[in-house]
């Protein structure tokens, strides 16, 4: 899917980690929530409330999930799951474009 139909989009950007991660929230007609954004080169740790599926649209990243013995690499066309009430570390060397699917 290259776009979302009839989405309600938050106009103000979410800016995290001094601008290293920038996203916009959107809600689809069925009530599902997503964020679409970019992560600039950095190593960042994110905490989750709800479960997330991180879909990589462009770029590449190394991800270490909480309690995982090793990191894994993901690139465009791949995704990874993060449990709710957890955390993960993501290392990005070139700009990463992503969609985060919540819940």
Curated annotation (Swiss-Prot):
Keyword vocabulary terms for this entry: Glycosyltransferase, Transferase
GO cellular component: cytosol
Catalytic reaction(s) noted: a purine D-ribonucleoside + phosphate = a purine nucleobase + alpha-D-ribose 1-phosphate; adenosine + phosphate = alpha-D-ribose 1-phosphate + adenine; cytidine + phosphate = cytosine + alpha-D-ribose 1-phosphate; guanosine + phosphate = alpha-D-ribose 1-phosphate + guanine
Gene Ontology molecular function: any one: guanosine phosphorylase activity
Cross-referenced InterPro entries: Ppnp, RmlC-like_jellyroll, RmlC_Cupin_sf
Catalytic EC class: transferase
E.C. code: 2.4.2.1, 2.4.2.2
Domain of life: Bacteria
Transferase recorded as keyword: yes
Family affiliation: Belongs to the nucleoside phosphorylase PpnP family.
Function: Catalyzes the phosphorolysis of diverse nucleosides, yielding D-ribose 1-phosphate and the respective free bases. Can use uridine, adenosine, guanosine, cytidine, thymidine, inosine and xanthosine as substrates. Also catalyzes the reverse reactions.
Protein name: Pyrimidine/purine nucleoside phosphorylase
Taxonomic lineage: Bacteria, Pseudomonadati, Pseudomonadota, Betaproteobacteria, Neisseriales
């Amino acid at each position: 899917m290259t776009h979302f139909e009839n989405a309600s989009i938050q106009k103000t950007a979410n800016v995290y980690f001094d601008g290293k991660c920038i996203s916009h929230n959107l809600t689809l007609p069925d009530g599902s929530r997503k964020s679409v954004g970019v992560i600039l080169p950095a190593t960042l740790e994110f905490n989750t409330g709800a479960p997330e599926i991180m879909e990589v649209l462009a770029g590449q990243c190394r991800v270490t999930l909480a309690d995982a013995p090793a990191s894994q690499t993901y690139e465009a066309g791949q995704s990874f799951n993060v449990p709710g009430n957890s955390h993960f570390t993501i290392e990005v060397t070139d700009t990463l474009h992503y969609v985060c699917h919540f819940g």
